[in-house]
Amino acid sequence: MQSTQSTESNLLPLVPAYDSILALAPYQTGKPIEELTREYGVSDVVKLASNENPIGCSPHVTLAITEQIGQLSRYPDGNGYYLKQALADFNDVNVDQITLGNGSDDLLDILARSFVGADDAIVYSQYAFVVYSMLAKMQGAMDVEVPAQRFGHDLKAMSQAIENNSNTKIVFIANPNNPTGTQLEHGELREFVASVPSSVLVVLDEAYIEYSPESNNRALLDEFDNVVIVRTFSKAYGLAGLRVGYALSSAAVADLLNRIRQPFNVSRVALAAAAAALADQDFIEKTRLINDEQMHWLEKQFDALGLGFIKSHANFIMVEIAVEMEDTNAAVIYQALLEQGVIVRQLEVYGLYNWLRISVGVAEDNMRLIDTLRSILTDD
């Protein structure tokens, strides 16, 4: 990556809006299968890095997409009428409480652009989604990282951080949390929201809510006007390649977000696919059952290998590569897995140098992972 100084000199006489943008590193996605094939010549690849649905998407989605093929020259419905109607019914909210996005990342960005300025602050937890810090830097704002508690959110400390920083405009909470998989209970979240000034937006990032439906905090919307819930169709619904998400909020907040979002920010194919996916809750139940079964199997395998892990409420698990194991730190294991066609996720960007995040796959992929991991650890 280029240094801040070299990037700045290369830009001149152009100058970015905020100096903090120069400190940003481009977001690193999970390594694509195609990239691994190019680099290592491996054709049989198992990707367990990006928390995608290993069984794909609902068959109803395929039909819905096919029906849109003849309409690709036409712009989509910019308001997403039919998808919003379906989401309103599903979540028991009014249509005017919904904002659609090009994935949930788009909505997080819209929220930051709508509410955060250069003199403001964004509060978030250590070991929470790295994009939260990036959003603060993009806005030239202060990013306030609160130390984690048992790899999860320390709500009392976060409340104190908001009190200490009166310029706080947004506090982000991922529940279940990415990348650790920890979960907050509804009661403690409600108590936290009640402690936050009404001028601070509490954004609940529920990208993995389908894997932990008991942590659904939809009821908070009825009680607090400063709560926004952001969800995605990229994970359990299996539409990561189409990019579609949604936000639930008060009508007033949604009105503002819809003023800021780009026109036609969700494609016609994505709108149709998301509506079809939402209608097939049997598929979501199947997804959840497979995930639970395979998660339990993986936990037993990690125990047998002597590897620690954090109990997860999502579709991934964070695994510790023991520090005392010579030449087997996470970076070494990550590279060795790549060379054998298995992609997982490094967590160095979070400061978790001895941990890997592993998505839960289907049985065949999980067995391939464990066999490869066992072979690497044994050889070392």
Curated annotation (Swiss-Prot):
Annotated family: Belongs to the class-II pyridoxal-phosphate-dependent aminotransferase family. Histidinol-phosphate aminotransferase subfamily.
Obligatory cofactor(s): pyridoxal 5'-phosphate
GO MF entries: histidinol-phosphate transaminase activity; pyridoxal phosphate binding
Keywords, alphabetical: Amino-acid biosynthesis, Aminotransferase, Histidine biosynthesis, Pyridoxal phosphate, Transferase
Top-tier EC class: transferase
Reactions catalysed according to its record: L-histidinol phosphate + 2-oxoglutarate = 3-(imidazol-4-yl)-2-oxopropyl phosphate + L-glutamate
PROSITE patterns with a match to the protein in the record: AA_TRANSFER_CLASS_2
Matching InterPro entries: Aminotrans_II_pyridoxalP_BS (IPR001917), Aminotransferase_I/II_large (IPR004839), HisP_aminotrans (IPR005861), HistidinolP_aminotransfase (IPR050106), PyrdxlP-dep_Trfase (IPR015424), PyrdxlP-dep_Trfase_major (IPR015421), PyrdxlP-dep_Trfase_small (IPR015422)
Keyword Amino-acid biosynthesis attributed: yes
Coiled coil: none
A biological process from GO: L-histidine biosynthetic process
Signal peptide start-end: none
EC number: 2.6.1.9
Organism: Psychrobacter arcticus (strain DSM 17307 / VKM B-2377 / 273-4)
Gene: hisC1
Protein name, per record: Histidinol-phosphate aminotransferase 1
Assembly behavior: Homodimer.
N6-(pyridoxal phosphate)lysine, modified sites: 235
